[in-house]
């Protein structure tokens, strides 16, 4: 049913990507039970975002295991080289591991959401401002981070103009195959 709903969401509702929250299922991203969904994402030519890193506490009554180490994307990226994988939440506390996966695999990207930009790990700021500027996408995980606050903090950062444009807009346009708006 899930694969049918994914196809329907893309073909009939205009969805441009998929989202997976591995912690809810207690299954790491490289669990083979996800592979039919990955194959469908490839067929539909859409990226899939998934939380990597530790699980945040959204509810004290339901604590979930942290099953999304960024290294688990390694096997998926190898098995599905055409699948565009976006590891969201920066991979914290394994940010270096997340950067390593994005650097190693052409099809792995990083979403810098769920953490206020002023609290981004220094290595992710360096990566997105230099050799990884084509691999990082901005996000807020609203309502976790207020978009206005996040933009103000990004504007306060010492980012190169080209890197900032890619972070905030260009990388998402390319990855999600979105049209450029007129006058942009």
Q: How should these model regions be labeled?
A:
Residues 1, 23-24, 67, 90-94, ...:
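Short beta->alpha connector loops
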Residues 1-56, 61-62, 182:
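Active-site gating/metal-coordination segments in enzymes
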Residues 2-6, 70-73, 94-97, 120-123:
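Alpha-helical scaffolding within the catalytic cores
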Residues 5-14, 36-44, 75-80, 99-105, ...:
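Acidic (Asp/Glu)-rich catalytic clusters
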Residues 8, 132-137, 145-184:
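Mid-to-C-terminal alpha-helical segments outside catalytic/metal-binding sites
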Residues 9, 18, 41, 89, ...:
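Conserved, mostly hydrophobic/aromatic
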Residues 42-44, 53-58, 62-64, 70-72, ...:
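Histidine/lysine/aspartate-rich catalytic loop segments that bind and position anionic ligands
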Residues 78, 84, 91-148, 156-162:
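Active-site-adjacent C-terminal substructures of enzyme catalytic domains
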């Amino acid at each position: 049913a899930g694969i049918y709903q994914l196809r329907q969401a893309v073909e009939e509702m205009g969805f441009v990507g998929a989202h997976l929250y591995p912690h809810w299922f207690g299954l790491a991203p490289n669990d083979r039970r996800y592979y039919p969904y990955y194959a469908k994402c490839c067929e539909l030519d859409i990226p899939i975002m998934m939380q990597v890193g530790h699980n945040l506490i959204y509810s004290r009554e339901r604590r979930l295991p942290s099953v999304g180490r960024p290294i688990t994307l390694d096997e998926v990226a190898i098995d599905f080289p055409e699948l565009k994988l976006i590891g969201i939440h920066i991979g914290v506390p394994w940010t270096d591991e997340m950067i390593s996966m994005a650097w190693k695999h052409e099809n792995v990207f990083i979403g810098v959401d769920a953490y206020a930009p002023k609290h981004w790990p220094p290595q992710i700021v360096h990566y997105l401002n230099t050799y990884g500027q084509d691999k990082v996408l901005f996000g807020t995980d609203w309502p976790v981070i207020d978009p206005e606050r996040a933009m103000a903090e990004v504007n306060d950062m010492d980012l190169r103009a080209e890197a900032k444009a890619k972070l905030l807009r260009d990388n998402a346009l390319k990855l999600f195959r979105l049209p450029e708006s007129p006058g942009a």
